[in-house]
Amino acid sequence: RWDVIRWSEIANEIFKVKSEGRRVKNEERRMKNTRQVIHGISMGAATTMAVSGEKTPDYVKCFVEDCGYTSVWDEFSAQLKDQFGLPAFPLMNTTSALCQYRYGWSFAEAQQIEQVRKSTKPMLFIHGDKDAFVPYAMLHPLYEAKTKGRKAIFIAKGSVHAMAYRDHHEEYTRIVKDFVSKEE
């Protein structure tokens, strides 16, 4: 009886791997003619920039980041100061150490600016000039860090955090469409 149970577990693993391999090949065939834009706002922008520095499939054509931050350290430090009037030291150091202990990564490792620096595919940077949550001042270092591949910038005049699309709907849409269409 144990032999049969064990064989069913082994067979499951064997056939799962084969069917997974088949699924991956089918997915690759399907994606061959796909063009993908990775576009994120706020935390999504941080994720977009984090992905931008990695090797991505050929169907990923470009990136659009809207109000992303330079690094977790910079963003959390800004929030401590602006929302609570607290200095970065010692809270950031302590919290980063706890994060390292508990989750295996420190704030120093989460640097979107370093990923942007490695990025080779085109990227559009968008930020509202009245953004205080992710300070507008973070936009230009990110833009300057992008030295490989095409880049463009859109500053949404008068927009606060994550409101560039709402405040400048037509202009935002046109700029994103124009940027993305150059990758077709």
Regions found by a protein language model. Name each.
Residues 129-134, 162-163:
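Acidic catalytic loop of the alpha/beta-hydrolase fold
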